[in-house]
Amino acid sequence: MPTSPWVTLAHIVRPQGRRGEVIAELLTDFPEKFAERRHVFLTRDAASDAAPREMELAGYRLAQNRVVLHFAGIDSIDAAEMLRGLDVVIPESERAPLDQDAAYISDLIGCDVWDEAAGQRVGIVQDVDRQASHVDLLVVDCENGQRAEIPFVKAFLVKLDTTGKRITMRLPEGLLEINASTATAREPRARRTRKRGLRKPITGADATPPDSQ
């Protein structure tokens, strides 16, 4: 799965007011990035070959989970309307370096999960659930057609290779069957394209998971 050299800070939803401002959905855990920058880039699709358009950031203000942006040269509602649906992105190279065993969520999406104990591929990471448990859960579409949720904990993690898109784990016997049943019983997740948002990194937790026997 090819990766984009860009990460997304926000997605422009619509014009805001009549002075050329736009309101955008935040896709970053680091909104202070807007205060640090004079320029950002706009694109319809960060994964495409088309070069994003560089824009001067004239102002911003936060509004709950959204941000109001004003770009230099965009001074009317008609001009702002032309920006509807665009993503606000920055180069991937501007992300902060990570500690060992930590990863940005966007880099985990699309990784193959391998079970070292069983010597086989489990499936591919489709999402990361940070809400349902005291540890982060890798949401994996398994080879057998089921969906499983695997705790991203150091007790299970053998090797994390986001460059090679591979996560090697040592999973307790029966864990996949139990967690696949739990995941299937929940409401189905909406299928959507995950943008490479600039999110806080997650680290394999130190917490020892409950005994799976």
Curated annotation (Swiss-Prot):
InterPro entries per UniProt: PRC_barrel-like_sf (IPR011033), PRC_RimM (IPR056792), RimM (IPR011961), RimM_N (IPR002676), RimM_N_sf (IPR036976), Transl_B-barrel_sf (IPR009000)
Domain of life of the source: Bacteria
Gene3D superfamilies reported in the protein's UniProt record: PRC-barrel domain, RimM
Subcellular location: Cytoplasm
Biased composition (Basic residues): 189-199
Gene Ontology biological-process entries: ribosomal small subunit biogenesis; rRNA processing
Known partners and oligomeric status: Binds ribosomal protein uS19.
Comment block on domains: The PRC barrel domain binds ribosomal protein uS19.
Protein name: Ribosome maturation factor RimM
Organism for this UniProt entry: Acidobacterium capsulatum (strain ATCC 51196 / DSM 11244 / BCRC 80197 / JCM 7670 / NBRC 15755 / NCIMB 13165 / 161)
Gene that specifies this protein: rimM
